[in-house]
Amino acid sequence: MFTHFSTHFHLPSSSSLFFLHPFYKSSSLGAVSFVAKDKEKRCRAISKSRTQEYEGVFQTNVATLKLSEINVEDVIVIDDEEEQDIRVGLVNKIKSILSSLEDGEITISAYDTAWVALVEDVNAISTPQFPSSLEWIAKNQLQDGSWGDSRLFSAHDRIINTLACVIALRSWNMHSEKCDKGMIFFRENLSKLENENEEHMPIGFEVAFPSLLEGARGIKPLMCPNDSPILKNIFEKRDEKLTRIPKEIMHKVPTTLLHSLEGMSGLDWKQLLKLQSQDGSFLFSPSSTAFALMQTKDGNCLKYLNNVVKKFNGGVPNVYPVDLFEHIWVVDRLERLGISRFFRHEIKDCMNYVSKIWSEKGICWARNSNVQDIDDTAMAFRLLRLHGHQVSAHVFKHFERNGEFFCFAGQCTQAVTGMYNLFRASQVLFPGEKILEHAKHFSAKVLKEKREANELIDKWIIMKNLPEEVGYALDMPWYANLDRIETRFYIDQYGAESDVWIGKTLYRMAYVNNNNYLELAKLDYNNCQAQHLIEWNVIQTWYLESRLGEFGLSKRDLLLAYFLATGSIFEPERSHERLAWAKTTALLETIKCYVRNEDLRKDFAKKFNDHIDVRDYSIARRMKRNKTEHELVESLFATIGEISWDVRLSYGHEIGYDMHQCWKKWLSSWQSEGDKCEGEAELLIQIINLCSNHWISEGPSMQSTIQHLLQLTNSICHKLSCYQKDKELKGISCQENITNSEVESKMQELVQMVFQKCPNDIDFNVKNTFFTIAKSFYYAAFCDSRTINFHIAKVLFEKVV
């Protein structure tokens, strides 16, 4: 599974780059261990700065790199106790957030609050039903006279919020000075609408804004302009859109139009009330529901608005509740940031909540909805499936028409994030799920076309780096996506609290976009990286003492072996698995390189078997290290002994005999089959699981499942290795070959076996090792050497700042 490195890649030197702090102990052949000393602080070393030269990054849909040099000019010594206190504090803050998830933490919309403030008391005349909403408006005008998001200026957002608030205050003859200030802002900034990206225009702006203008003209002091070319253009768009609204249909079946009823004329409220949501709202929109209450005096509308106004102390958001949206997106962010392991229990609760509400027609942003959208459905589908819940791919048939997929019924265009999440969901497919294959091809085509046209702008969110996020997904298929690589890039892409969502107005989701998540992710990443650099030092020492270089293993191959292990298993507490994986891979490559013909293979296998003493399978620990013709066999034995000894110290289990048997099985196949031997993946899987303290039941049904998984993974990984060798020989990329080969169907079967829960199932951690190994082989076969060099430099040696 190795590929040749670019000559531009300079390996870090063990002696010059990294050091072990005196409080760290490590065997040259074993895992890193930590020795505590009373009242003394442990430290970690991590590179602070490097000289790098990047050229042609992400060209022709794949990352390329010219890395002239990696060196360390300085080191940062991190106070471990202080770091631990910060990390614990952040984890506790986030746990508190996750335990408090309810209907959604969302910012207030001045526009919607204004509509609520306009409602007249249902039991009185000329009295506001919600005086606290008027209070909120009066208290939340910005210094420039506008209302809206205070941290991001959007002319569309500020204009519609400001006009709505001025109308509300004027309607009740309140705060004339605030109204005047608001109208000055309105007139001075109206022209800015012309220069803004239409993709970032609030939802339904072209219908809602003209309705407000018409209402404002009935209030004399407002003096709204009526001769502006911009306004004329908006009214034309309004008229065009209204002619396309199927009013007959909107009165009969639930559609997204229920979310934007405010200001619309000619509505049959008797029919529309039949489409009301269970909570009394019209598709969870306070402004739409407020308008409905004005027209109908409906008690359920009043009940919904009373609850929301009370919840938000007078103001109301642009949509509420958003419970499903929040639960799903929070889990996605935590997982991609690489910190989900701190919140396993809370994430399980989140997914159980979503699972209870999931329907065969899909979901939307809130529970008990008669309208579904592909964005929330795709995100929920993907996460539910990956967390072992039973969900059918047939759900996506509700979002497909005439060969195309849409976000909502009746929608004409595809939003970038909707297609992006559909693309991500479509990759988690089981055998025979044609609808997901179709969804994958369609969404990929849409996204690639938008990328080529430089149109990766979304109408639902303004985020830090959507083009790079989508580009990563397009260029790195899920089967090849190693966890640590994704996390390293996503930490740079995640905007945290700077990301803004687009509804009827701009809004923020404090529990989805949270600085605490990003801070913990950065701290944890650098902490993990620090340990990885120490382990890389250990691996290099082991490499020198084992003299593997003399048998043909290059340092480049050694680094790739460690990178594949670290990219897949990154957690500090899993050092045994990571080091065992890297050393096993290095030994496999060395043996295959040094022992080439069949006679030598048989001789090597015989020497190994002759050394095995089942009564004392730690014999290798006492073998002399003087150079002999059997040194490679001795290095193998010594490594097995050291790995088993470290595991015994940590978990109290003796795995030496089992490791010998695993190697014996592989050598037996390899001596007769040579390059045709399919057992490398099996050897890695068995050793990783032995080192992980995850023990496999001996029951016949369990063993049958394990054998099937082994056969499947062996076949996949062997074919990927063949593709990789072919790629290296021909000097070409084999990406298309992988995509069009039988590997895809076998990967689908493997995904189903790993992620679909069955009665009396084996431990998921054991099953997931099979998929983890398969992904590492897929990655090595899929990516070219420049891409791998770039990933190694970024993931292992570039500190997150």
From Swiss-Prot:
Residues recorded as binding substrate, renumbered to this chain, are: 241, 459
Q: Which UniProt keywords apply?
A: Chloroplast, Isomerase, Magnesium, Metal-binding, Plastid, Transit peptide
Reactions listed under catalytic activity: (2E,6E,10E)-geranylgeranyl diphosphate = ent-copalyl diphosphate
Give a single Pfam family match. Terpene_synth
| Gene3D superfamilies documented for this protein | 1.50.10.160, Farnesyl Diphosphate Synthase, Terpene synthase, N-terminal domain
EC nos: 5.5.1.13
The family annotation for this protein states:
Belongs to the terpene synthase family.
The protein, known as: Ent-copalyl diphosphate synthase, chloroplastic
